[in-house]
Swiss-Prot record:
Reactions that this protein is recorded to catalyse: a 1,2-diacyl-sn-glycero-3-phospho-(1D-myo-inositol-3-phosphate) + H2O = a 1,2-diacyl-sn-glycero-3-phospho-(1D-myo-inositol) + phosphate; a 1,2-diacyl-sn-glycero-3-phospho-(1D-myo-inositol 4-phosphate) + H2O = a 1,2-diacyl-sn-glycero-3-phospho-(1D-myo-inositol) + phosphate
Lineage: Eukaryota, Amoebozoa, Evosea, Eumycetozoa, Dictyostelia
EC number(s) given by UniProt: 3.1.3.64
Keywords: Endoplasmic reticulum, Golgi apparatus, Hydrolase, Membrane, Transmembrane, Transmembrane helix
Protein name, per record: Phosphatidylinositol-3-phosphatase SAC1
Role: Phosphoinositide phosphatase which catalyzes the hydrolysis of phosphatidylinositol 3-phosphate (PtdIns(3)P) and phosphatidylinositol 4-phosphate (PtdIns(4)P). Has low activity towards phosphatidylinositol-3,5-bisphosphate (PtdIns(3,5)P2).
PANTHER family in the cross-refs: PHOSPHATIDYLINOSITIDE PHOSPHATASE SAC1 (PTHR45662), PHOSPHATIDYLINOSITOL-3-PHOSPHATASE SAC1 (PTHR45662:SF2)
Chief subcellular location: endoplasmic reticulum
Domain SAC per the UniProt entry, residue ranges: 119-445
Subcellular compartments: Endoplasmic reticulum membrane; Golgi apparatus membrane
Lumenal topological domain: 533-535
Topology of the protein relative to the lipid bilayer: Multi-pass membrane protein
Length: 581
């Protein structure tokens, strides 16, 4: 699709160059949209004209007024059932009026620039996907299971899953009037990659991130009282054999569904804090699993956290509540303990525990446009972050599902060698590794740990070193950058937030951290200046080492004391408030 955008002093006029019979008009004063027959005659002053706009994200209101969000580039990443899926690129926010920012106070102007940078950062992350004619928010099973009367004549925006419709609240002006729905283009944060196998078979992996309770690693954990969990992602693997013949297998990941937090405090592993009473936690958990059952059927919980430390308390609280639920099979596999020493071959122990459920749940299979069988249940996998261990296990689960698919139906459709050999191994492992990196970056800021196993099928020393590098990056980002990133998620997913009273985000680290490190360097400098050289005598070595260790220890104590001022925290909302609503 190529859209011409004409920006006048009174309205935006959008013309689909593929269909000039109708044009979309957005009135800047009333913020209402309407359809005009043909290209309207325009006697108004044209401020700007942009050709080849690829889509409209919607209209967002900030302190100074409204902005039209568009994107001007896209990248074709996959084709599913003959319909193309694209990655959104080159986002632009256009103010309704050129001088609208100058009409507000200088502090409000500064705050608005910051809010604009948050929106631009999120939308320009290249993590958003869309399709002009494919309902990207629904799995293939849900698309085929939806009745014709529900979808007949309806636009994409009217039938998609609101959990994955990230710009739903920004296109309301297009959904209120008849005939405007065709301009609605749902965008979804997630991951899409597709490769060809054996010349004709298409292997596609799609992930959709739930916008409810979205955010960053340590700022958003657990569940809210509506049953929404942090880092909630639905992943669908599609094997397309020929036109109208394909299989689909779906699984999900999400934070442990209890009221708990782990806010950053400069500690490598911050303390876990629990919220609410027994009733509140049970109600939230039951609501979550009720939603899972309505969407997918029976649930197998694969809990990968440690049976020691803070993770043990979480695991025990989770196990106690979830075992009383019907249609839920709970498996606690202590990944780190069982697979320590890079013994990832021991993951076969877990797969033996899951094989019966894999057979029972099956997969979705359509042959020549007709439903042959449906997937009857879902695997819900989690670790503490729902990233690294989770991605490793999800890739194994889907591989075993693929083996079942090949044994039961695909062997009649394609050669048995399609899912064997070097080409398949390369495609499968690399797509799942790319997926792990993308989902991890959205939540933690870095690629996934343990991804060398996903990419190559084995752990190696180089992968361990890469994990160390990513762990250091995560520590820095989670403590000193995630406040801004969390505010970006919150601002975009909560357009009703009152920005007139919101506190402006401050860059970190502030002066306390500077003073602390200045003290360390000063102590080291003075030690070198006045104490005997560390190389001249044992006494000199002991003296300098004592000063160095003491300075570092004192600096760390000061840092922990002032961590509230040092850690980059979100400012658009109070962190604790998300556990009270």
């Amino acid at each position: 699709m190529n859209i011409e955008l004409i920006n006048t002093n009174e309205r935006f006029i959008l013309i689909n160059n593929g269909n000039k019979d109708k044009s979309l008009n957005i009135d800047k004063h009333s913020v209402k949209a309407s359809i005009s027959v043909g290209v309207p005659k325009n006697n108004e002053k044209v401020l700007t004209r942009i050709e080849n706009v690829k889509g409209i994200i919607g209209c967002i209101q900030l302190v100074s007024g409204h902005y039209l969000m568009i994107f001007k580039e896209h990248n074709h990443v996959a084709t599913v059932t003959g319909k193309k899926i694209y990655q959104m690129k080159d986002v632009e926010l256009i103010p309704f009026f050129p001088n609208q920012q100058s009409l507000v106070s200088i502090p409000d102007q500064d705050a608005e620039e910051q809010h604009l940078s948050m929106i631009r950062w999120l939308l320009s992350s290249e993590n958003f996907y869309f399709s002009y004619d494919y309902d990207f928010t629904l799995t293939l099973q849900r698309q085929y299971s939806t009745t014709t009367t529900t979808t007949s004549g309806s636009s994409l925006g009217e039938r998609c899953d609101s959990r994955f419709f990230w710009n739903e609240k920004y296109v309301t002006i297009l959904s209120k009037e008849h005939g405007l729905g065709d301009w609605i283009l749902p965008i979804t944060m997630g991951f899409v990659e597709s490769k060809t196998l054996g010349g004709t078979c298409q292997f596609t992996l799609i992930s959709r991130r739930n916008l409810n309770r979205s955010g960053t690693r340590y700022n958003v954990r657990g569940i809210d009282k509506k049953g929404n969990v942090a880092n909630n992602v639905e992943t669908e693997q599609i094997i397309e054999i020929k036109e109208n013949t394909f299989t689909s297998f779906v699984q999900v990941r999400g934070s442990i569904p209890l009221l708990w937090s782990q806010f950053p405090t400069l500690k490598y592993k911050p303390s876990v804090k629990f919220y609410g009473d027994e009733k509140e936690n049970s109600q939230a958990l039951e609501q979550h699993f009720k939603q899972l059952h309505q969407l997918y059927g029976s649930t197998t919980v694969v809990n990968l956290i440690d049976r020691k430390g803070a993770e043990l308390k979480l695991g025990e609280a989770y196990e106690e509540r979830v075992k009383s639920l019907k249609d839920v099979h709970y498996v606690w596999f202590d990944f780190h303990s069982i697979c320590k020493g890079m013994r990832y071959d021991k993951l076969s122990i877990l797969m033996d525990q899951l094989k019966d459920d894999l057979k029972q749940y099956g997969f979705f299979f359509v042959e020549d446009g007709k439903i042959v069988q449906k997937q009857q249940g879902v695997f819900r996998t989690n670790c503490i972050d729902n990233l690294d261990r989770t991605n490793v296990v999800q890739s194994l689960i889907t591989r075993h599902s693929l083996e079942n698919q090949m044994a039961s139906v695909l062997n009649k459709q394609i050669p048995s060698t399609t899912f064997k050999g070097d080409q398949f191994e390369y495609v499968f492992k690399n797509i799942w590794a790319d997926h792990g990196d993308a989902i991890s970056t959205q939540y933690s800021g870095t690629g996934a740990l343990k991804n060398d196993f996903t990419r190559t099928g084995k752990r190696n020393f180089q992968g361990v070193l890469r994990d160390g590098e990513n762990s250091v990056k995560r520590y820095y980002l989670n403590n000193f950058k995630d406040g801004f990133r969390q505010d970006s998620y919150f601002l975009f997913t909560n357009p009703s937030v009152d920005l007139t009273t919101a506190k402006q985000h401050e860059s970190k680290p502030p002066s306390p951290l500077i003073w602390i490190f200045s003290f360390v360097f000063a102590a080291i400098f003075l030690a070198n200046l006045y104490l005997p050289s560390a190389t001249s005598s044992i006494g000199g070595f002991i003296s300098q080492t004592t000063v160095l260790v003491g300075s570092v220890f004192f600096a760390l104590k000061l840092a922990m004391k002032y961590q509230a001022s040092i850690v980059d925290k979100p400012t658009l909302f109070k962190l604790d408030s998300i556990y009270k609503n």
